[in-house]
Amino acid sequence: YINSPESVDRGYITNEEIHTMMNTDMPDKTHELVRDLFIFSTFTGLAYSDVKNLTEDNLQTFFDGNLWIITRRKKTNTESNIRLLDVPRKIIEKYKGMTRDNKVFPMPSNTTCNKKLKTIAELCGIKSRWTYHVARHSAATTVLLSNGVPIETVSRLLGHTNIKTTQIYAKITAQKISQDMEILSHRLEDMEKNICNAIQ
């Protein structure tokens, strides 16, 4: 039996690692840019090629008055509409006007991004092997699912053609299970008390 890419345990970064990354001084502007792009993808779920192809035209104020990315995934040509949170909005503002040809970001090559991410992980004292694609997995796991966003919404945000794909990406953390059971425990407190009393 050979592990297909679909069944491989997918890596992601944790909240703590995101904070460490943002609070670690970067050695130069390129490392800083790569870090910002990685965080941008962590908060939007966009893959490298989709961030690279992002133009000002993809940024639209939508029906709810918020800024959205309206785009199609390069890999699958599936529509992907993402309402922007504050973090990616701030990153877009930071790099505004730095590119020609209407692109949102001055994007280094994927190889450069992965090399710089390796250095950034070392600077942060993190042993995990980071590649740019880890950001997309982290969006599914750390940002969206761990904070209670329903899997159907995550699937649409990531532009998946099939919810099964989202289930592969979305490794629910033990922490999330613990939090959910804690909430459930509070909700069931009275019921459990009555049953436990009856068990004695």
What residue ranges belong to the model's regions?
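Catalytic-site neighborhood detector that most strongly recognizes the C-terminal catalytic loop/helix
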Residues: 73-77, 110, 158-183
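C-terminal catalytic core of tyrosine-transesterase DNA break-rejoin enzymes
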Residues: 39, 43, 49-50, 119, ...
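Acidic, low-complexity interaction regions
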Residues: 111, 119, 124, 196-200
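Short, charged phosphate-coordinating catalytic segments
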Residues: 16-17, 41-64, 152
